[in-house]
UniProtKB/Swiss-Prot annotation:
Principal localisation: membrane
Record's protein name: Glycerol-3-phosphate acyltransferase
A single cellular component GO annotation: plasma membrane
Topology within the bilayer: Multi-pass membrane protein
Organism: Maridesulfovibrio salexigens (strain ATCC 14822 / DSM 2638 / NCIMB 8403 / VKM B-1763) (Desulfovibrio salexigens)
Alphabetically ordered keywords of this record: Cell inner membrane, Cell membrane, Lipid biosynthesis, Lipid metabolism, Membrane, Phospholipid biosynthesis, Phospholipid metabolism, Transferase, Transmembrane, Transmembrane helix
Function: Catalyzes the transfer of an acyl group from acyl-phosphate (acyl-PO(4)) to glycerol-3-phosphate (G3P) to form lysophosphatidic acid (LPA). This enzyme utilizes acyl-phosphate as fatty acyl donor, but not acyl-CoA or acyl-ACP.
Family per record: Belongs to the PlsY family.
Molecular functions (GO terms): acyl-phosphate glycerol-3-phosphate acyltransferase activity
Pathway as given in its UniProt record: Lipid metabolism; phospholipid metabolism
Gene behind this protein: plsY
Residue ranges of the TM segments: 2-22, 52-72, 78-98, 112-132, 145-165
Entry EC number(s): 2.3.1.275
One protein family per Pfam: G3P_acyltransf
Length: 195
């Protein structure tokens, strides 16, 4: 029964659409209908400004980090922890507050793995930032992160988390499917074009 509580808690917390709330409260816009129509930090930053994008990023990371860290204090069972982590990320992608729609889950995945495999996450974030800096495409950086995460999770010794990391890779590619299509057609928005 306690497992069910933790899964529901993680899913509920993951479902909270902080980006949507920030957009409505801070810049009076529905980010689901403007820009990339994503509720993530990138779209918040584009529409509302950098500081609000950072706020959305931190909150989305926290909703992955907090339930996993709390659950880890309850049990070190890797299956249990993986399920809690997955519930938080799935909550972000399929939010009960947005008719089972949501964001792309990069920030929430980062939060989950900062709690479980911080070194692997750090290295993966370095690749994410490097690709964004070089290419100008946040989506390309996110996809690079998705590929790097299982690799660094394995090589840094967090072997028990590799299946979860692989699952997150598949999910992140799925949530970025439209970005992948736009990248292939040369139609993806680049931060560099804004300068």
């Amino acid at each position: 029964m306690l497992w069910i509580f933790w899964l529901v808690f993680a899913y509920f917390l993951g479902s909270i659409p902080f980006g949507l709330f920030i957009g409505k409260i801070c810049c009076n816009c529905d980010i689901r209908t403007e820009g990339s129509k994503s509720t993530g930090a990138t779209n918040v930053a584009r529409l509302c400004g950098f500081k609000y994008g950072v706020a959305a990023l931190v909150l989305d990371v926290a909703k992955g980090f907090v339930p996993v860290l709390m659950a880890y204090q309850y049990s070190h069972n890797w299956i249990f922890i993986s399920l809690v982590a997955a519930a938080a990320v799935i909550g972000h992608v399929f939010s009960i507050f947005m008719d089972m729609k949501g964001g792309k889950a990069v920030a929430t995945t980062i939060g989950v793995f900062l709690a479980l495999a911080p070194v692997a996450t750090f290295y993966s974030i370095v690749f994410l930032l490097a690709v964004i800096a070089l290419s100008g495409f946040v989506s390309m950086g996110s996809l690079t992160f998705a590929v790097a995460l299982p690799f660094f999770t394995l090589v840094t010794g967090s072997v028990g988390m590799v299946p979860l990391a692989c699952g997150m890779t598949v999910l992140l590619f799925w949530t970025h499917r439209e970005n992948i299509r736009r990248l292939a057609k040369g139609q993806e928005n680049s931060w560099k074009k804004k300068k």
